Regions:
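Short, surface-exposed beta-strand/loop micro-motifs that present aromatic residues
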Residues: 171, 178-187
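Residues at beta-strand starts and edge strands
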Residues: 150, 188-189
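Conserved strand-loop elements at the edges of beta-sheets that form or border functional pockets
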Residues: 9, 174-176
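Short, surface-exposed loop or secondary-structure junction motifs
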Residues: 1-169
Length: 189
């Protein structure tokens, strides 16, 4: 389909990560470290967990008919954090802490700055955190995303009355593979 006519969840973030590698001449993780993690003081974020920090990595669980059991499977190598991955995905696989993730969320709320340092331009933050999909295109989204739109790599609350959980209009955020989630509500600052 033509861009702007439909919505489909895709591997676009993975492709963007590969483009970043070609343009920057760096591995994706190195680019993220230099451009985001270091300026944002994100000291516990990356695509693998060093041996010295593995005791801090929580065990993920899944619900089965016999109760909760540790999650041991992987998907596209996401879940294997004891070594650097061959492919650093633009769409999955980062490991972080609540503290580190909050620095990224705070930077977005501050319009692209963190502790006086410019990380992203205000225009980039606006592109990420404002609804970009036309109403007709939003109809293509999964039922579980009813009431949401998308910015660029960010989910945006467009109609809070249609959302199954707690949300307010303009709230934006993202969720991770094993249930982590962040949301900013800029109007509530």
């Amino acid at each position: 389909f033509q861009p702007g006519t439909h919505w489909r969840y895709s591997t676009c973030a993975d492709i963007l990560g590969a483009v970043v590698e070609v343009v920057s001449g760096m591995r994706f993780g190195e680019f993220l470290r230099k451009e985001f993690f270091e300026p944002l003081d994100m000291v516990d974020t990356g695509f693998y967990v060093p041996e010295s920090k593995r005791n801090r990595l929580v065990t993920a669980y899944k619900r089965t008919e016999n109760g909760l059991v540790p999650w041991t499977s992987t998907h596209l190598a996401v879940g294997v954090y004891d070594r650097e991955p061959a492919f650093e995905s633009g769409g999955a696989g980062l490991v972080s802490t609540l503290e580190d993730y909050s620095h990224f969320a705070d930077m977005l709320l501050a319009g692209g700055t963190y502790e006086g340092r410019r990380i992203l331009s205000p225009a980039t933050v606006a592109c990420m955190t404002q609804a970009q999909l036309k109403d007709a295109v939003r109809r293509d989204m999964w039922d579980s995303l009813d009431g949401y739109s998308y910015g660029h790599l960010m989910r945006i609350c467009a109609e809070p009355g249609r959302i199954a959980g707690l949300a307010c209009e303009g709230e934006y955020g993202w969720d991770g593979w094993l249930g982590c989630y962040f949301a900013n509500a800029p109007q509530d600052q």
